[in-house]
């Protein structure tokens, strides 16, 4: 296995400069590349601010902060940026044609042994890999925002990714003090979005079908299901643009994995993107982030079985389709969604039989989308 020292990060936005920072903190030599010097100047400023803040808080010494900063070199020229790279982490916007264009350029200038890792939350890995001359050296890597704070990284091999590249990527994730979960098959949404995105839509259907209010559903999700915040609150925190994009990508890949609720598209079109725009499902004031008033009293008014059924059916689907196993799904849900209690533990408390019955009832009223996964049926 190669001794990894030199990393190039393509794209210096929020995710890109965050990944550059965590890599430099772990001791790697990092080249940060973008198409304009102005973008790089801004990114380097943000990295400096972030490191100085850590030093002020006493998390690292000022000397360490300066050393980390000095390990990141901003470069505009692509050929120069990848000249000594062993691993290239690409963090350009999630637009398939743009990614393919970047890889065509990259494939032409990078050394033949260089590994390419695409930071993506939903785009098909194999499809991008097949556009280059080295699909066996291509892998998906999904950091969560902000990379400096979020512990979880999904690692997604394409159909042709070599075992050596999978091992090396997982080693890299461990070296930057993150926890990796391996999504063994390149399925729509990978693990986290396969659980989270359909659940947002399901919460909208739940309002329509049960008459429960937003704060009742959110309170039940927080207090009964052990989420760190309500599902609508989490959607506002994530951003409707992100959810809308993930919905489209997942739906394009497989119409059976998601049943889009029209509300998401309407909110996206109306630019109600959540916290970042001041309004999503809830309204936010500019001055500071206010928590939505959720309570155990409100939670008692709502039975969240429809939502549990949805997320569990999707978790079971991941196992049945050999993309993951229960242990990895629980790890992903804990680190990526902040779940305080394992999903399948909650399911057993509610009763798998009750969940399967709920899915059967939903399927009889609303169609095949709700048919229970064979794994859940076998567990009851």
Tell what function each PLM region has:
Residues 1-53, 57, 109:
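NAD(P)+-binding Rossmann beta1-loop-alpha1 motif at the extreme N-terminus of oxidoreductases
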Residues 2-3, 26-28, 178-185, 208-380:
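NAD(P)-dependent Rossmann-like dehydrogenase/reductase catalytic/cofactor-binding core
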Residues 32-49, 53-65, 155-166, 180-181, ...:
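Rossmann-like dinucleotide-binding cores of NAD(P)H-dependent redox enzymes
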Residues 39-42, 53-116, 122-124:
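Rossmann-like NAD(P)-binding element
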Residues 115-194, 198, 229, 240, ...:
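Rossmann-fold dinucleotide-binding core
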């Amino acid at each position: 296995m190669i001794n990894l020292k030199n990393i190039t990060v393509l794209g210096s936005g929020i995710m890109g400069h965050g990944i550059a920072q965590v890599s430099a903190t772990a001791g790697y030599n990092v080249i940060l590349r973008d198409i304009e010097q102005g973008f790089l100047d801004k990114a380097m400023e943000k990295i400096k601010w972030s490191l100085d803040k850590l030093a002020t808080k006493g998390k690292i010494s000022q000397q360490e902060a300066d050393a980390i900063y000095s390990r990141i070199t901003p470069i505009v020229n692509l050929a120069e940026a990848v000249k000594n790279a062993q691993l290239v982490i690409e963090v350009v916007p999630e637009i398939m044609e743009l990614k393919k264009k970047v890889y065509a350029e990259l494939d032409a200038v990078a050394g033949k042994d260089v590994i390419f890792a695409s930071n993506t939350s939903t785009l098909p890995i194999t499809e991008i890999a097949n556009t280059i001359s080295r699909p066996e050296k291509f892998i998906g890597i999904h950091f969560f925002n902000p990379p400096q704070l979020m512990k979880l990284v999904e690692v997604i091999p394409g159909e042709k990714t070599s075992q050596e590249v999978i091992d090396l990527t997982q080693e890299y994730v461990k070296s930057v003090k993150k926890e990796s979960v391996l999504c063994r098959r390149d399925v729509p949404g990978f693990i986290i979005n396969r659980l989270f995105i359909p659940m947002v839509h399901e919460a909208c259907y739940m309002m329509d079908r049960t008459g429960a209010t937003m704060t009742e559903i959110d309170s039940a999700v927080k207090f009964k299901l052990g989420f760190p915040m309500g599902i609508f609150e989490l959607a506002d925190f994530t951003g409707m643009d992100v959810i809308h994009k993930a919905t489209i990508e997942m739906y394009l890949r497989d119409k059976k994995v998601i049943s889009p609720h029209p509300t998401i598209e309407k909110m996206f079109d109306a630019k109600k993107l959540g916290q970042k725009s001041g309004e999503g499902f809830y309204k936010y004031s500019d001055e500071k982030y206010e928590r939505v008033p959720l309570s155990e009293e409100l939670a008692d008014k709502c039975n969240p079985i429809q939502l549990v059924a949805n997320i569990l059916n999707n978790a079971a689907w991941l196992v049945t389709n050999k993309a993951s196993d229960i242990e990895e799904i629980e790890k992903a849900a804990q680190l990526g969604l902040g779940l305080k209690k394992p999903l399948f533990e909650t399911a057993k408390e509610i009763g798998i039989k009750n969940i399967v019955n709920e899915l059967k009832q939903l399927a009889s009223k609303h169609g095949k989308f709700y048919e229970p996964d064979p794994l859940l049926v076998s567990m009851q």
